[in-house]
């Protein structure tokens, strides 16, 4: 297998459909056109033609599109055949194309990978293709499209350019120490560095928003049996996702629901009631509950308000709180306010949010929705955003750390060499986002997660 091979893959989803598309990219795409179509179509024009088998019989008829390189998606010669979407027809056409020497099936994401390697896309834009396909909400789709069109990359490139100018200034001060003006201490470098830090902080805030749109928030509902966990899952989901009875231990396995709150994906997980297991099935369910809790972004600690007046989680169930991961955020949810007569709404107890509601009637659930959105820093009014992945957040975080360390070197010791090195490392972190400095291993992992025909 060679990266110089001509590749072919189905670009439409498997299964039956009105239209099925095969995409070919590489130097032999021209030969495929001449062999299967009998001619080379006019570049970038839709040509209605028969698709022929090796014996000259017609396999299908449809639209052929010819994009000679470098003016194509991949930067190579690209041919697209748009025929009928029957699996048998597409399979026959694919087999016919693969009889031509030098053709092979594309690896997952190989078309996008070739576009990146041929400078048609940077890495952030290439990732945005997969994110656009996987978008689970309108807001996520719009943000992914912004990333594909270069919004995220432009912000990163602006930061890289600013760091380049700052590095030139710092290194000039190092190389010419005998000048009358002390460039390191005249305040200009500090002012420029502060501007870059402020711009980076703004990009980080927007990237966190973009990461929420892509990844969502994992919320686990946990508590004792019969506290109303499944009722709360149903209330948040807006449908009967879980069976609800008065029998303690009804939920024995993990139940998952995927919803959106004003565009923010929310993965809600209902777990088995936590207690001493009465049988092997319940024991396994409780073990799985703890596994989900340990991986959560937030835990909703469900409390049956009819069983206790306590509001402090450490007082309600100290053993449960002691077992939770140290930095895991907790929201205490006192349920059954319709029975206890408690005032609905949110307050705070010992640093934890406390919400009183009725999962059965739905009263107070909207307060919980808003709390979940706000606790993750999700801003529904942020327009023109972009999607971001965890690797992007890590790169931005590392760049910010290097800039702060560089600032400390500047203000503490006027150490120009150390400042210059921190600026270089920050610049390298940012360049990893767009793929200017990226390992082959990372590229392999990124593109292997794509669809075959992308």
Curated annotation (Swiss-Prot):
Keywords: Cytoplasm, GTP-binding, Hydrolase, Magnesium, Metal-binding, Nucleotide-binding, Potassium, tRNA processing. One of its GO terms (molecular function) is GTP binding. It is found in: Cytoplasm. The keyword Metal-binding applies. Mg(2+) binds at residues 230, 251. Its main location: cytoplasm. Exhibits a very high intrinsic GTPase hydrolysis rate. Involved in the addition of a carboxymethylaminomethyl (cmnm) group at the wobble position (U34) of certain tRNAs, forming tRNA-cmnm(5)s(2)U34. Homodimer. Heterotetramer of two MnmE and two MnmG subunits. This is tRNA modification GTPase MnmE. It comes from Escherichia coli (strain 55989 / EAEC).
